[in-house]
Amino acid sequence: VKKLLLAALMFTTPALADIELVVSKRHQSMEVYQNGELIDVMPVSTARKGYYTPVGTYYPYSLQRMHYSKKYDNAPMPNSIFFNGGYAIHATPRVNNLGRPASHGCVRVSPSDSATLFELVRQN
């Protein structure tokens, strides 16, 4: 099961391995668990002032290697893991903003972390 918990946002999916991603909006970080064991902690950016990142337990419903935002001027969203409507975990080139709120609501991660997460979720 793969699970995403934002702030506590939790993300799970039925799978070979139990994958759980726990996003802390307070700490602007994501803990990655596999079969209950913490395997990584990565910096993230959630919604900046005036925007909202949803809180709750979610399951991924769509994975897209390259998605372009329909809402924000075709902004590229590499390695998108959609969990609630248009909200996704995806790569950002603005890695200097990671660790603080900076998004329109999605959970932004570094390009290398997004590739790791995408494969982890895709394979499980």
Annotate each PLM feature.
Residues 43-44, 58-60:
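Short, surface-exposed loop motifs enriched in S/T, G, D/E and P with embedded aromatic residues
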Residues 12-14:
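N-terminal signal peptide c-region/cleavage motif recognized by signal peptidases
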Residues 16-49:
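A structural motif detector for short, solvent-exposed N-terminal "entry" segments of globular domains
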Residues 29-31, 59, 88:
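General beta-strand recognition
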Residues 18, 48-57, 64-124:
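Exported/periplasmic cell-wall-interacting domains
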Residues 1-7:
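Sec-dependent signal peptide recognition
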